[in-house]
Amino acid sequence: MRAESQLFVSPAPICDRLVTLAEISNRDHILEPSAGTGAILRAIRDTAPEAMCDAVEINSGLVRYLRENFNGVRVQCGDFMEWQSVQYYSRIIMNPPFSHGQDIRHILRAFSLLRPGGVLVAVCLNGPRQQEKLLPF
C-alpha cells in the first residue's frame, strides 16, 4: 500500500461499529463512496444482506475486485467528488481520504446525496476544521 493512494483498509471492528451506528436494515439503499477493498461493504452485507448497495471506487483494479466479490452491489468506477448520482440514499457509510481536508469535502459531498431523514456515518479527524465545518450537521 502506497501512502499517495490513501487506501487504508478499515479494520473489521471499525466497519462493524460504523454499520451499527448507521442502524441499517434490509429496506435501506446504502452508499459506500470510497469502497476500497470492500471492508465496509462486507460489514453491511453481514448485517443487512438484502439492502440495496451502491459503491464508488476510483481505482479500476479495486473496482474489478469489488464487482467480482460483492454480487448485487452496483460498483461505479470514478472519483466520488465528481460522480453524478441519480438518486438519494437512506444510509451513507464511509471512511473517506483524510489528507488536506479531504475528509471534510467528502463528507459534505455525501450529505448532498442523503435522503431527508437519512443517516450518514463517517470516520473523520476530530480537528478544529472538522468541528467548524461538520458540527452544524
Where do the protein language model's features map onto the residues?
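Class I S-adenosyl-L-methionine-dependent methyltransferase catalytic core
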Residues: M1-F137
